[in-house]
Amino acid sequence: IVPQLKLLYNPQMKSAYNFVPGVMGLILMLICAMMTSISIVREKETGTMEVLLVSPVKPLFIILAKAVPYFVLSFVNLTTILLLSVYVLDVPVAGSLFWLVVVSLLFIFVSLALGLLISTVTRTQVAAMLVSGLMLMMPTMLLSGMIFPIESMPVILQAISAVLPARWYIQAVRKLMIEGVDVSLVLMAVSYTHLRAHETLANL
């Protein structure tokens, strides 16, 4: 008997299979969190935010007016990335396209919320850019599994990566898009990993 090694999900060893989910997470996080926070802080710097707040318009509608355009822009970018992945890079969508879009929309919503949170604690555009870059962009690139495998990281970095939304999004996209698994298995895998992360944090 001669054993043979066969790669189940990427037999041709294409690098696009690995970096496409990571690029999706990075671009969506960049557009939603960083651009939203900078846009709102710009209004605070120029003084137009105070004018808007004293106007008859409700604060909720002011926030929605800032967030909805980036939500739409992120959806357009998501569609563009998927089209380029399938028709240019030959990365198939092996699983459910519907659930892939649903998971992506949830991630966009979370990223927008993070951008709004950053805009409330910063007063200048430079500060908003630094906070979103250092607190979101760099961890997303280095600790989300986009470049380096999470399993090879030290335990403390694995615990830190557990709080990054991009980690769970990239993991879900890889399972839905590359592995083609059912969404229930994705939820089970994410829940199990999240539970293990809590146990790791408790033992530190």
Provide a role label for each language-model segment:
Residues I1-I31, M35, E199:
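Transport-system extracytoplasmic interface segments
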Residues V2-L5, P149-S191:
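Short hydrophobic, aromatic-rich alpha-helical segments embedded in or entering the lipid bilayer
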Residues L26-T48, L116, T120:
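A hydrophobic alpha-helix feature that marks transmembrane segments and, especially
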Residues I38-F71:
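Helix-loop-helix units of permease transmembrane domains in multi-pass membrane transporters
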Residues R42, V88-V93, T122-R123, I147-S152, ...:
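Short helix-capping/hinge motifs at transmembrane helix termini and TM-loop junctions
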Residues P59-G133, M138-M141, S184-V190:
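Alpha-helical transmembrane segments and their short interhelical loops
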Residues T122-V163, R167:
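Transmembrane helix segments
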Residues T193-T200:
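Conserved small/polar residues in nucleotide/adenosyl-binding loops
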